[in-house]
Amino acid sequence: MNCFKIPVSLIKEFESISANFFWNNSDNNKIHWIAWKKLCGGKKTSGLGFKDLRTFNLAMLAKQGWRIFKNPNLLLSRILKARYFSRGEFFDAKVGCNASYTWRSILDAQPILEDGIRWHIGDGRSVQV
């Protein structure tokens, strides 16, 4: 889960199985009284705290991207740098034409990391230095 992006169809299947288990359905014809997305909300926001698998999967992929960025001397980082972004940094890396599924999965989480570590300065009103 932390190296590969889980396909949406598989996530939907997991959510369906989990919802059926929660609602104690032995067959698929019973009513689910609350949408699964609402059950996945936090307990403070009237949810039950179930994990949203898509978000969790992206978080795990972002964690791998962060490891590659922060630890350039790791064997994994050196291999990926030599193979996919030898002339730049992790945040400048692109998918390329012959990228592995693991690398494409990690790059899917790259925008999450960019939003989290780079400041986007607008008019400067809300930035205090």
Can you say where each PLM-predicted feature lies in the sequence?
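A helix-boundary/hinge signal
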Residues: 1-129
